[in-house]
């Protein structure tokens, strides 16, 4: 099959000749349409003096000004993105946010303090007691290595910076690199102007800022840069067929694998791109060289990450890439045979080869899956195809808020006007299709599906939405701002008609030709009126202004609040800081034994280990479902049953989060049903979810609530002494502001626990587990008497009406005294 040339459509040519491509789209210096080398035939004959040397000479050329302006716009986009992510640092302080970043910070601190080798072999004894955790083989180390390397470089240059500050500002710094990689990718797909718009969009869009604010030291902060840069290098590889660009793509993919588990998206999207190109009969040597090199080298590099290991050749998530690689080799071999066999021989060999290959692949996959060599889809990936699978079979996956389906409001909240313009950009790419635009179309369609299934994957949709929206805005500006420039600067070409061009020998009578009258159909298209252009341009600029305002507002109010520090605002605008979390963790650090074991729900494990430096039973790694279910069973059981579990796990303290006083909705009572469901999955005989609902199927904490709920350990620890508290005169004592109900069990007493600490706003409550008594008290039966059987003994001290009797009491008789007279 002939190799298709890169399609340059008529539409693309018009884009490259517009002034929007030069300034507001700045895109055509790389195509050479307006470069200094384009000269007419007459001007080329006469030599012209060369341009002046130096900086002024470079800037006198159009390409020089375009490069300077492009650099300035990218720098301003980086600066705007970095600045908009600093709200949390300005309002609060330089602090690590959320839950997972605390483990990442703790690991990075260990790496910076003890070195890379010690980090790889680190056994964390403060996690998952009594099991522990081997950290080096269970994490993606790219984030820690990046922060540690930056910290080492700064200290080598005698710039003293604490590792915490490096971790806090790492994600805002990488947001600028993400803008640059998005610019490069969009420029390859369309033109430079669309790339600049895409860089500005992704710098401030809330969908990306949500995971890259200052303090959000998580894998996604650097992974989106690696994702976009890998895609850029892949598109470059497909366009050029160069092994150099493919090797660069493999190195970027290796960094992506080391940084985030979302690398699976890359290793499935790139094979899908190659497969669709084969279906569209767009096979070429460029595609063969790019994918063959990428798959082999990328496979070997990805297996160097300890946490990944042999997964690329033994898990179902990676089998599509292997299948496309085999298909591509077979396709290339058939192309080779097609040039060397007759048509009849090729058809016979083709059908025979396809049948044998399909049967061999089918049987091999069945055999390897049946024998267990190829692992099935993991629960988290399987839930992407069956959205109800996790809630039924693996409730711990469904309990994470990031794994819930995305609402329609979230799309507008995180993307704003880009949601509306993104389909237009996709249509432009499909209308003027080529190899790289097939890739971005597949990227967009797959990202939309995954973002609709899981809230967390909105992060992978945001970059492609910014790219395609930039293409849409770029086309609008080209059409409405470039119309006058096209008419003022018509292309330099001969005015003769096509017949004159075909027959240059007849040009001697050209001057005597009579021009035909131009009909209505032959008249050149008139430009748009100034009113229409002004209205459309102002409308587009207003939309962009509204987008910028929305992004700033969302970043400031929704995504710049650290979860470990809460804030509330009074009617006069003053702010109240609720620092209960750090207060409680600091109390644990200062007032408990260094080796004390703290039991809490898994959400707070990383924070307890990071801030309190105490041993936890479970944490956010969630690798051992049975261990988490055991903690959930203890929280869901009554005090006596829970005490046995806590004693078996050597628990010293129990920590719960309670938001009934301040109205905090993320407390443990609202998470309690997930504890019950996870515990029921492992202990169905002891824990049943239906026991915690009323007969009407309601989950209530008031008097109408289930007796099982009102007497479980979580309920008692949350509401202990709360029934005595009256928050205001309008509500009764024990009124829960979060659930808007008066609690049903106010007389709560503990036998095996005692309150150790309650934070200022009752947000964090810590209980100490009592040691077992040396001698257990025995329950005595009531004493009985011989007079009245089975009657309780009553002493004189308790009543004056009834006398007690002494058993076997001696009876004395009064004797007679003898008189003297008788004697």
From Swiss-Prot:
<dbReference type="GO" id="GO:0032991">
    <property type="term" value="C:protein-containing complex"/>
</dbReference>
<keyword id="KW-0328">Glycosyltransferase</keyword>
<comment type="pathway">
    <text>Protein modification; protein glycosylation.</text>
</comment>
<dbReference type="GO" id="GO:0005789">
    <property type="term" value="C:endoplasmic reticulum membrane"/>
</dbReference>
<feature type="glycosylation site" description="N-linked (GlcNAc...) asparagine">
    <location>
        <position position="620"/>
    </location>
</feature>
<feature type="site" description="Important for catalytic activity">
    <location>
        <position position="211"/>
    </location>
</feature>
<feature type="site" description="Interacts with target acceptor peptide in protein substrate">
    <location>
        <position position="402"/>
    </location>
</feature>
<feature type="transmembrane region" description="Helical">
    <location>
        <begin position="243"/>
        <end position="257"/>
    </location>
</feature>
<dbReference type="Pfam" id="PF02516">
    <property type="entry name" value="STT3"/>
</dbReference>
<feature type="site" description="Interacts with target acceptor peptide in protein substrate">
    <location>
        <position position="100"/>
    </location>
</feature>
<feature type="topological domain" description="Lumenal">
    <location>
        <begin position="84"/>
        <end position="170"/>
    </location>
</feature>
<feature type="modified residue" description="Phosphoserine">
    <location>
        <position position="18"/>
    </location>
</feature>
<dbReference type="GO" id="GO:0006986">
    <property type="term" value="P:response to unfolded protein"/>
</dbReference>
<feature type="transmembrane region" description="Helical">
    <location>
        <begin position="348"/>
        <end position="368"/>
    </location>
</feature>
<feature type="topological domain" description="Lumenal">
    <location>
        <begin position="454"/>
        <end position="457"/>
    </location>
</feature>
<feature type="binding site">
    <location>
        <position position="456"/>
    </location>
    <ligand>
        <name>dolichyl diphosphooligosaccharide</name>
    </ligand>
</feature>
<feature type="short sequence motif" description="DXD motif 1">
    <location>
        <begin position="98"/>
        <end position="100"/>
    </location>
</feature>
<feature type="topological domain" description="Lumenal">
    <location>
        <begin position="550"/>
        <end position="823"/>
    </location>
</feature>
<keyword id="KW-0808">Transferase</keyword>
<feature type="topological domain" description="Cytoplasmic">
    <location>
        <begin position="2"/>
        <end position="41"/>
    </location>
</feature>
<feature type="transmembrane region" description="Helical">
    <location>
        <begin position="458"/>
        <end position="479"/>
    </location>
</feature>
<keyword id="KW-0812">Transmembrane</keyword>
<dbReference type="GO" id="GO:0043686">
    <property type="term" value="P:co-translational protein modification"/>
</dbReference>
<feature type="glycosylation site" description="N-linked (GlcNAc...) asparagine">
    <location>
        <position position="613"/>
    </location>
</feature>
<feature type="topological domain" description="Lumenal">
    <location>
        <begin position="369"/>
        <end position="407"/>
    </location>
</feature>
<feature type="topological domain" description="Cytoplasmic">
    <location>
        <begin position="241"/>
        <end position="242"/>
    </location>
</feature>
<feature type="short sequence motif" description="WWDYG motif">
    <location>
        <begin position="601"/>
        <end position="605"/>
    </location>
</feature>
<feature type="compositionally biased region" description="Basic and acidic residues">
    <location>
        <begin position="517"/>
        <end position="526"/>
    </location>
</feature>
<feature type="topological domain" description="Cytoplasmic">
    <location>
        <begin position="190"/>
        <end position="191"/>
    </location>
</feature>
<comment type="function">
    <text>Catalytic subunit of the oligosaccharyl transferase (OST) complex that catalyzes the initial transfer of a defined glycan (Glc(3)Man(9)GlcNAc(2) in eukaryotes) from the lipid carrier dolichol-pyrophosphate to an asparagine residue within an Asn-X-Ser/Thr consensus motif in nascent polypeptide chains, the first step in protein N-glycosylation. N-glycosylation occurs cotranslationally and the complex associates with the Sec61 complex at the channel-forming translocon complex that mediates protein translocation across the endoplasmic reticulum (ER).</text>
</comment>
<feature type="transmembrane region" description="Helical">
    <location>
        <begin position="42"/>
        <end position="83"/>
    </location>
</feature>
<dbReference type="GO" id="GO:0008250">
    <property type="term" value="C:oligosaccharyltransferase complex"/>
</dbReference>
<comment type="subunit">
    <text>Component of the oligosaccharyltransferase (OST) complex. There are 2 OST complexes, OST-A and OST-B, which contain STT3A or STT3B as catalytic subunit, respectively. OST-A and OST-B contain common core subunits RPN1, RPN2, OST48, OST4, DAD1 and TMEM258, and OST-B contains either MAGT1 or TUSC3 as specific accessory subunit.</text>
</comment>
<keyword id="KW-0597">Phosphoprotein</keyword>
<feature type="transmembrane region" description="Helical">
    <location>
        <begin position="192"/>
        <end position="209"/>
    </location>
</feature>
<keyword id="KW-0460">Magnesium</keyword>
<dbReference type="GO" id="GO:0043687">
    <property type="term" value="P:post-translational protein modification"/>
</dbReference>
<feature type="glycosylation site" description="N-linked (GlcNAc...) (high mannose) asparagine">
    <location>
        <position position="624"/>
    </location>
</feature>
<feature type="binding site">
    <location>
        <position position="218"/>
    </location>
    <ligand>
        <name>Mn(2+)</name>
    </ligand>
</feature>
<feature type="topological domain" description="Cytoplasmic">
    <location>
        <begin position="280"/>
        <end position="284"/>
    </location>
</feature>
<feature type="transmembrane region" description="Helical">
    <location>
        <begin position="263"/>
        <end position="279"/>
    </location>
</feature>
<feature type="short sequence motif" description="SVSE motif">
    <location>
        <begin position="399"/>
        <end position="402"/>
    </location>
</feature>
